[in-house]
């Protein structure tokens, strides 16, 4: 009898433990189903379980030491954080609705703090709507479709910095609307049309408003087809094009009633002026 009771108690205990394990497993399944998905590649990617939200996080840092030797003077060294960028991008609700945010923290990016002036931490803050592979519509602050060297990220340059021509003549960033039509094919003639209507005041402008706007239009031609891995967006031929690839582009920019010496950049003008820019680019990779 005692053996029978002991056996029954053992069976009941095993069943109870099994039930506990089953419940615990079910609870874990529920918890796991609520966790986001992680991906790696261009930074750290986080996607919600229902795939309605995606966030990619990455940063970029460039530290620089410079040696200076002028004739008749003692040698000198300088060290600086040339660039420090933090970038967020992804989509909300649907992969057709995207966003991008880029912040900068290096002294050369932020600039000197002055009374009544904004701190230039925000570089990009824009939302995109891409209904298909050809059309893109943008609203917010980001780069204008200007010269190629400026459009390319500073992390995709051939050398450590852009040219002095870019520093003087670029149209840089602005706040407004942009619309792109992209028609790229791998092995045949391709072209892109990019347009923008913006404030013309440059990034992070909060001073007095006016009725002047900036208009930008750009045409890109690729006679031998599109570049591998979006090769127009980085200077070196790291993708190793097996056939010649050529990019010819021209942009026209008119900044009506500009307030600054370089349109979107520079110091304040004594009188508002309308500025016009023509930007031509060519890129060959083979």
What is the predicted function of each stretch?
Residues 204-286:
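Surface-exposed beta-loop-beta
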Residues 8, 22, 65, 194, ...:
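Intrinsic disorder/low-complexity detector
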Residues 31-33, 75, 114, 269-270:
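Intrinsically disordered, low-complexity segments enriched in polar/charged residues with Gly/Pro
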Residues 17-60:
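N-terminal periplasmic/intermembrane-space "pro-region" immediately following the signal or transit peptide
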Residues 38, 170-171, 273-274:
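A short catalytic or substrate-binding loop motif that flags glycine-/basic-rich loops and adjacent residues
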């Amino acid at each position: 009898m005692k053996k029978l009771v002991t056996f029954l108690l053992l069976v009941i205990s095993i069943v109870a433990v099994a039930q506990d394990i089953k419940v615990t497993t079910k609870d874990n399944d529920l918890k796991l189903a609520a966790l986001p998905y992680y991906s790696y590649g261009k930074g750290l990617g986080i996607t919600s379980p229902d795939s309605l939200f995606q966030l990619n996080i990455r940063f970029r840092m460039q530290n620089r030491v410079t040696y200076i030797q002028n004739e008749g003077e003692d040698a000198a060294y300088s060290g600086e954080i040339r660039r420090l960028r933090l970038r967020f991008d992804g989509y909300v609700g649907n992969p057709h609705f995207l966003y991008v945010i880029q912040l900068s923290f290096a002294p050369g990016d932020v600039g000197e703090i002055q009374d009544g002036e904004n701190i230039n931490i925000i570089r990009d803050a824009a939302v995109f709507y891409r209904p298909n592979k050809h059309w893109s519509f943008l609203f917010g602050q980001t780069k204008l479709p200007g010269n190629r060297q400026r459009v390319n990220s500073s992390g995709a340059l051939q050398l450590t910095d852009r040219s002095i021509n870019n520093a003087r003549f670029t149209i840089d960033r602005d706040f407004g609307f942009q619309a792109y039509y992209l028609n790229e094919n791998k092995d045949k003639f391709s072209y892109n049309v990019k347009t923008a209507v913006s404030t013309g005041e440059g990034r992070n402008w909060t001073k007095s408003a006016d009725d002047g706007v900036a208009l930008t239009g750009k045409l890109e031609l690729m006679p031998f087809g599109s570049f591998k891995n979006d090769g127009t967006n980085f200077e070196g031929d790291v993708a190793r094009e097996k056939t010649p690839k050529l990019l010819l582009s021209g942009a026209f920019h008119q900044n009506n009633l500009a307030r600054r010496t370089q349109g979107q950049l520079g110091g304040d003008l004594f009188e508002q002026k309308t500025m016009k820019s023509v930007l031509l680019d060519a890129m060959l990779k083979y």
